[in-house]
Amino acid sequence: MIRRLQDNGDLIRAFPRVHFVGIGGAGMTGIAEVMLTLGYEVSGSDNADNVATRRLATLGARVMRGHSAANVLGTDCVVVSSAIREDNPELMEARSQRIPIMPRAAMLAELMRFRHGIAVAGTHGKTTTTSLIAAVLSEGGLDPTFVIGGQLLAAGANAKLGAGQWLVVEADESDGSFLRLNPLVAVVTNIDADHLENYGNDFSRIKDAFTEFLQRLPFYGLALLCLDDPEVAELAGKARRHVMTYGIDAAADVRAEDVVQDGARMYFTLCLPEGKVIPVTLALPGRHNVLNALAASAVGWQLGVPPEVIGRALKSFVGIGRRFNDLGDVAIGNGACVRLIDDYGHHPRELEAVFAAARGGWPDKRLVVAFQPHRYSRTRDQFDAFAAVLSSVDALVLSEVYPAGEVPIPGADAKALARAIRARGRSEPVVVGQVASLIEVLPDVLQEGDLLLMMGAGDIGSIAQRIVHDGFVFGEV
């Protein structure tokens, strides 16, 4: 049936039904929630059930477990995650029925079409920076729409449809899909060698993609670039758009001075253009989070948020799910306890930043790390860097690599990584086959007063939650 667009331009009534294949993915749930709030009939499928899919169901989405051709019948558009294979039965059925298929980033670009877009790109720190920008703009009364890759703890969600004109999103460089976006403001936090498999194992192609990302800005657009990152600093010199820099670097336009850490809090002086200076308290540990806060401050200043309001937003920001989440003290037996921190970090540079934050906040505690490597290709490409940073902790437990759909690569598994760490002569890592075994193994490694970091982008976060709710397992299982 051929449908006519309504004279009043109400496209929602003309094409109301949107189906998401892989709806439980971090990049998909936020778009689905915004479209639900806009009035679309949203359905979706995923092989796994999680907090995000259950939330969407309570909001009115129809969520199916597993993939079936029948799931797309009657839908007007199919949105697909980059993790979905071309032979997925729902995609095949959509093609046979001539239903439009849109990649996730293309649908995000459609949402941006009707608002002023702020896109946050970078290998690390995107989620935290995007969340901080949303918090600053919200505190400033701009009521932005935001779509974030992690759960904003204050909102209990990773997306919100605001009444204001600004849309704040993460721009995913991992597969080059950020080049579909046409923002008004582009933030680049850092550029690192990750997801090389999508760039022909050529780091220069990643850097070229970021250059092209900035070229997608209109001539009146703005690039906000972190001067502390050498690759981004180089990009700043080549950008053919209006540029504003931020960083702890003394030459940055928006910068932090007198940076001090006390436990999980950072204190610094925020120096804005035109001589504006305010003291800031940030409830996120680590210098990397100071940089994230500076990016949000720069955006807020550009959009007219008063400096004192920026400071208030940063102080009240409570964080994002799985970004240095302090889960409190957990018992390890005999009346002893350890402090448990859950974190999404899965790249050597992220591990290094989190370790520095942990040592800066708790210098007297022994640092024990349970790490689940993510992807065999990343473990292979960053093998030496992983071995170097992981050998710096006081005690280490490695689980097997979370494959994320990849097949094993010889020499890029947990045992090989443990051998490389052991060869450095600084630590004796323990290797477990399944991540769930951490519940049984960790009590034998931990000591009273330790700081335990559980890190990785796979399913190790669910194990941290099990430990909080059910405790460790002692003795025979």
UniProtKB/Swiss-Prot annotation:
Root EC class: ligase
This protein's name: UDP-N-acetylmuramate--L-alanine ligase
The organism's place on the tree of life at top rank: Bacteria
Pathway(s) where this gene product acts: Cell wall biogenesis; peptidoglycan biosynthesis
Molecular function per GO: ATP binding; UDP-N-acetylmuramate-L-alanine ligase activity
Protein task: Cell wall formation.
Keyword Phosphoprotein tagged: no
PANTHER family for this protein: UDP-N-ACETYLMURAMATE--L-ALANINE LIGASE, UDP-N-ACETYLMURAMATE--L-ALANINE LIGASE-RELATED
Catalysed conversion reaction: UDP-N-acetyl-alpha-D-muramate + L-alanine + ATP = UDP-N-acetyl-alpha-D-muramoyl-L-alanine + ADP + phosphate + H(+)
SUPFAM superfamilies hit by this protein: MurCD N-terminal domain, MurD-like peptide ligases, catalytic domain, MurD-like peptide ligases, peptide-binding domain
GO biological process, alphabetically ordered: cell division; cell wall organization; peptidoglycan biosynthetic process; regulation of cell shape
Annotated positions binding ATP: G122, T123, H124, G125, K126, T127, T128
Family named by the database record: Belongs to the MurCDEF family.
Main localization category: cytoplasm
A GO cellular component entry from the record: cytoplasm
Pfam families recorded: Mur_ligase, Mur_ligase_C, Mur_ligase_M
Compartments where found: Cytoplasm
Gene name tied to this protein: murC
EC number(s) on file: 6.3.2.8
HAMAP family: MurC
Keywords: ATP-binding, Cell cycle, Cell division, Cell shape, Cell wall biogenesis/degradation, Cytoplasm, Ligase, Nucleotide-binding, Peptidoglycan synthesis
